[in-house]
Amino acid sequence: IVFLVRKGNPKKIKDWGDLARPGIAVITPNPKTSGGARWNYLAAWAWALKQPGGNAATAEEYLGKLFKNVPVLDTGARGSLTTFAQRGIGDVMISWENEAFLASRELGKDKFEIVVPTVSILAEPPVAVVDKVAVRRGSTAYLEYLYSKEGQEIVARHYYRPRDPEVAAKYASTFPRINLVTIADFGGWAKAHATHFADGGTFDRIYAR
């Protein structure tokens, strides 16, 4: 999870703390309706916990300030990209890294740039083999290819961080090192959902303020 800002970064946004500053307009979807937005939220929460004296109370206070800076809470990532890139609303958009790269490439590198925060979360799209159809559909071969050198090269060229060490080293300039947490740090998705996104959870408390 990274930040997409306007070219030249006129608001000097460098890390999560800047997103809670007065006068900063942040674009992110609604965590109640968007899976991608939940990764954004959890990455911000993780950063807040890692600050001096950080705990659940200070993280909730920080997220409250951040969401007060969100002028439009779209239902999904595509809507947020339209709001930010086409409607020109917001100073910064919280985004999956590959989506930020693609937006910059397709909409104009002269319009946007990417800021990598000090802390983020490892957001991994799931992939699995279903036994009953594995032979018929060749899904096992696909999965093996995905993690081959050639497959990992394709992954990197499409702006996903490769897992293969050699390929990762080759693309080190594209993907700066970053302090990553995982969903396991939140006790897994079931616990994260119950704590943060279920009715009456932390997001509801934050947004009701």
Q: What label would you give each PLM region?
A:
Residues 1-49:
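A conserved helix-loop-strand patch within extracytoplasmic ligand-binding domains
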Residues 132-209:
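Extracellular/periplasmic juxtamembrane helices and adjacent flexible linkers that interface
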Residues 51-117:
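Ligand-binding pocket segment of bilobal, Venus flytrap-like solute-binding proteins
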